[in-house]
């Protein structure tokens, strides 16, 4: 059933895959708003900042949900990796990135090692994809690793235009094992825990 309050799309995925960039670009193309949930909640009483990890943690889930729902309007594009916070969108797109490439990107950004490891493991283990599927069933999955941003944008446009959503098959655990990255990230994780 159609709900007039539904946002147009949710662009989700592990931090560092390009959600915010694509949300803003898609919103500009559609002449609507990109609601970046992280930016919306930063500095509110619903989250607390953890300086050593350079991240926010949700401390009031109900309050955060109400805040997000109070801002989202029909047609908006939402960007977040915390799928529990958003109203049901018309379409859900999970952006994916190879864990070794994601590791390099987050390191380039100067993120703390623990935060990098948490996010790389989340990508290897499909955490955001699984949460999205648990909530909405089948969702589109786009591997951005070897795609130019313009190619990803074209796939997103087709998906939100009501056309058939492109969906890649991703197996980052197998990929990481075959490439040797899994051994590297396990070793790094063990050394970080001491």
From Swiss-Prot:
Primary enzyme class: transferase
Annotated stretches, region: NMP: 36-59
One BP annotation, GO: rRNA processing
Taxonomic superkingdom: Archaea
Positions of region (LID): 108-118
Database matches in Gene3D superfamilies: P-loop containing nucleotide triphosphate hydrolases (3.40.50.300)
A Pfam family per the record: AAA_18
Keyword Protein biosynthesis (UniProt): no
Record keywords, A-Z: ATP-binding, Kinase, Nucleotide-binding, Ribosome biogenesis, rRNA processing, Transferase
A molecular-function term among this protein's GO annotations: ATP hydrolysis activity
Catalysed reactions, semicolon-separated: AMP + ATP = 2 ADP; ATP + H2O = ADP + phosphate + H(+)
EC number(s) stated in the UniProt entry for this protein: 2.7.4.3
UniProt KW ATP-binding keyword: yes
Binding site for ATP: 16, 18-21, 109
InterPro entries for this protein: Adenyl_kinase_AK6, P-loop_NTPase
Job description of the protein: Broad-specificity nucleoside monophosphate (NMP) kinase that catalyzes the reversible transfer of the terminal phosphate group between nucleoside triphosphates and monophosphates. Also has ATPase activity. Involved in the late maturation steps of the 30S ribosomal particles, specifically 16S rRNA maturation. While NMP activity is not required for ribosome maturation, ATPase activity is. Associates transiently with small ribosomal subunit protein uS11. ATP hydrolysis breaks the interaction with uS11.
Subunit structure: Interacts with uS11. Not a structural component of 40S pre-ribosomes, but transiently interacts with them by binding to uS11.
Family: Belongs to the adenylate kinase family. AK6 subfamily.
Name of this chain's protein: Putative adenylate kinase
Organism encoding this protein: Pyrobaculum aerophilum (strain ATCC 51768 / DSM 7523 / JCM 9630 / CIP 104966 / NBRC 100827 / IM2)
Phylogenetic classification of the source organism: Archaea, Thermoproteota, Thermoprotei, Thermoproteales, Thermoproteaceae
